[in-house]
Curated annotation (Swiss-Prot):
Residues 1-18 form the signal peptide. Its main location: membrane. It is a lipid-anchor. InterPro entries: YbjH (IPR010344). A lipid is attached at C19 (N-palmitoyl cysteine). It is found in: Cell membrane. This is Uncharacterized lipoprotein GfcD. The gene is gfcD. It comes from Escherichia coli (strain K12). A lipid is attached at C19 (S-diacylglycerol cysteine).
Length: 698
């Protein structure tokens, strides 16, 4: 213990003296790097650093006992989240070879780190973190840690409980408060989120130093490990030293190579791939905006001029089925935006097209954006102000554009104007990739398929929509069973998923939807048919979303029957009502955050609430987590305790060369069970009314 006390004293002196050091000739540090477990840190131990907001990392680390696969994202400057799969190479997935073959054990877990204090001139940065939440608890633990930079050095000192503190090199200070803090449970219910063991059990001091070498790509690490590895799931691991050393080589701005020597006897290597969701920008090859070239004003709308404007509105400004009308001193334009995610870009292009050829006496341009024939918002622009903006003004004489967003104009009373008719029938063919991680038969299961979809508008409100899925290739032949859980008493509302996806061709959905703009911020829809892969039925939804408000409120009510996986045009005997009241909130103090709370009845007839929190970054990429808590007991629910998941929503135009409003969603659900499961509705009013949200930057 004297040796440990001497070491801790040296670390404390180093941190204290570092506070007075100055940056002289050393290059700027490359910034934080990922630890072995994922998330910013040293090697096995964490530090108090958090990557720049929006940074997303994919990590791999490998040694004799473990492989760590992780992703980490800095959601805010003060919050970081990590998802990890751990391959325990010395243990089998299960003792039944017929069930899981010779696959090694896979453990899944979630970590977070919260900054408590930002680094200043004198004081270090301080953070609290928790490892292995909602997992099996193999690496469960928490820590308090401080980091201070001084020149090319970054010093870290902290205290850990649980796995990272198993060495017990210091008495747990909370034991002085109560004896209950002296002991920690040795097992956990898999999938539970519990803080009942926080700051309990053995505790250890850990620390380390990172050194930014004069050669910019290279960063060195030295840490004192708070773990003794005597109770690892992989077995008792020999530890010749508590000191671990490592190096990080930044091969590119988006890639790190890692090499370390740990426990005095083990080599660890790996890599990190990174990007920043705030910095991503589409490499678009788009048509330029129309130049400001005003033509002489005409008397009324001229057919040839309007025809050219309608063509430009469709192909340059991205408005499908554009329509132009002139009433009094206002020129009205409406259409369905299919091209630009940013509504301001669409309105700007439309204004440029219209202002170049205005009839006499027009003082205002009114642009109404629609979705599925429902009017979303009208942007009114003063013509004189617009002309000044486009013509340019002398330095110091510029004026703000006189423009406002108002409730959508109802032009139906005016009759039809000049327009390009909508193609009522449309179809598409889209490749799909379904993925599953951590299954018993294989760590990675996938299915590549083709979704053939078609839509037909009978009227401006009534839509018929259908899709057929065709399998191209999968490795589902490795399935050894349907994996129906034996530890749950709930109706099998989702756990028959393997039986459904074994079909090579099936009708994914075939439904009729009636959409209605009810006015004053109210929108509604009624629908019926084969609504998703596993359910058919009828339902309706009503949404109230005030214009430019940070909140909305919706309700959906459905009655569904389960489709038969052996013949997906037929049904099983199971049916149920399901529906939710959902509140949506964009907190003004948390830029880009959307919170959703849905309360109601799930498919298994359990009742409860689902909370979904998503962070949208500057690029449009959104990262979200969700959890569903219902009135089902843990015993009835089975492994996992409750449903939860993680997703990333990526705008297509970040991956294409042209503007695009579509998105790709990558989702991860650690374990699919039957509790807390919602109907997967293809059309949902809140995302359909996105134009009613205040544009980013306004």
């Amino acid at each position: 213990m004297k040796k440990n006390s001497y070491l801790l004293s040296c670390l404390a002196i180093a941190v204290s003296s570092a506070c007075h050091a100055e940056v002289l000739t050393y290059p700027d540090p490359l910034g934080s790097s990922q630890s072995d477990f994922g998330g910013t840190g040293l090697l096995q131990m964490p530090n108090a650093r958090i990557a720049p907001e929006g940074e997303f990392s994919v990590n791999y680390r490998d040694n004799d006992q473990y492989r760590f696969y992780s992703t980490s994202v800095a959601l805010f400057p003060w919050l970081e989240g990590t998802i990890r799969y751990t391959d325990v190479r010395t243990r089998k997935y299960s003792q039944w070879e017929d069930f899981s073959g010779d696959q090694s054990y896979k453990d899944k877990s979630f970590d977070f780190k919260l900054r408590l204090w930002e680094e200043g001139y004198w004081l270090p940065q301080v953070a609290f973190g928790k490892r292995d939440i909602a997992g099996t608890g193999l690496f469960d633990g928490e820590y308090l840690v401080a980091s201070k930079q001084a020149g090319p050095f970054d010093f870290t000192l902290g205290m850990a409980w649980g796995y990272a503190g198993n060495a017990g090199n210091i008495t747990n200070p909370f034991c002085r408060v109560s004896d209950k803090y002296c002991h920690r449970a040795e097992s956990h219910d898999a999938g539970d989120i519990s803080f009942s063991d926080i700051f309990r059990g053995p505790a250890s001091i850990f620390g380390g130093i990172e050194y930014q070498t004069p050669w910019n790509p290279l960063r060195l690490k030295l840490e004192y490990d708070g773990n003794n590895y005597q109770n690892d799931f992989a077995g008792k691991l020999p530890q010749a030293s508590h000191f671990n050393v490592g190096a990080v080589y930044r091969a590119a701005s988006w890639a790190d190579l890692n090499l370390s020597y740990e426990r005095g006897n083990t080599l660890m290597f790996g890599f990190t791939l990174r990007t920043n969701f705030n910095d991503l920008r589409p490499a678009l090859r788009d048509t330029p905006k129309p130049a400001y070239q005003p033509a002489p004003e005409s008397e009324g709308l001229q057919y040839t001029t309007v025809a050219n404007q309608l063509t430009a509105l469709k192909y340059n400004a991205g408005f499908d089925a554009p329509e132009i009308q002139l009433r009094d001193k206002t020129l009205y334009m409406s259409g369905q935006q299919y091209k630009y995610r940013d509504s301001r870009e669409a309105v700007d292009r439309a204004n440029r097209i219209l202002v170049n050829n205005l009839p006499q006496g027009v003082e205002k341009i009114s642009v109404t954006q629609k979705r599925e024939h429902m009017a979303m918002v009208t942007t009114e622009t003063d013509v004189a102000s617009l002309r000044k903006q486009l013509a340019g003004t002398a330095p110091g004489q510029s004026e703000p554009l006189q423009q406002q967003r108002v409730e959508a104009e109802d032009l139906s009373a005016f009759g039809r104007g000049y327009r390009i008719r909508e193609d009522r029938f449309s179809y598409s063919f889209n490749p799909t990739l379904s993925q599953s991680l951590g299954g018993p038969e294989d760590f990675y299961m996938f299915q590549l398929g083709l979704m053939s979809s078609a839509r037909y508008w009978f009227t401006d409100h009534l839509l018929l929509d259908g899709g057929i899925f065709t399998n191209i290739y999968n490795n589902y032949d490795k399935f050894k069973s349907s994996l129906l859980p034996a530890d749950s008493t709930l109706p099998r509302v989702r756990t028959h998923i393997r039986d459904y996806v074994r079909n090579d061709v099936y009708l994914n959905n075939l439904q009729a939807n009636y959409f209605a703009d009810l006015g004053n911020g109210f929108y509604g829809q009624v629908y019926g048919g084969y609504l998703e892969t596993m359910y058919a039925g009828v339902g309706s939804e009503l949404l109230y979303r005030p214009l430019d408000a940070c909140w909305a409120l919706g309700v959906d009510v459905n009655y569904v029957k389960q489709r038969d996986w052996d013949n997906m045009m037929r049904f099983t005997d199971y049916s149920t009502p399901t529906g939710f009241v959902t509140a949506y909130w964009n907190p003004p103090t948390l830029n880009g955050v959307l919170m959703k709370l849905s309360v109601g009845q799930y498919l298994a007839k359990d009742k409860g609430a689902t909370i979904d929190v998503a962070k949208r970054f500057d690029s449009g990429v959104a990262v979200g987590v969700w959890a569903a808590i219902s009135n089902v007991s843990k015993d009835d629910y089975g492994e996992g305790g409750f449903s939860k998941g993680f997703y990333i929503s990526i705008p297509f135009d970040l991956m294409t060369i042209g503007p695009n409003r579509n998105r790709a969603v990558v989702s991860w659900t650690p374990l699919t069970r039957d509790g807390g499961q919602m109907l997967s509705r293809k059309y949902q009013l809140y995302p359909m009314t996105a134009e009613r949200e205040v544009p980013v930057g306004q």
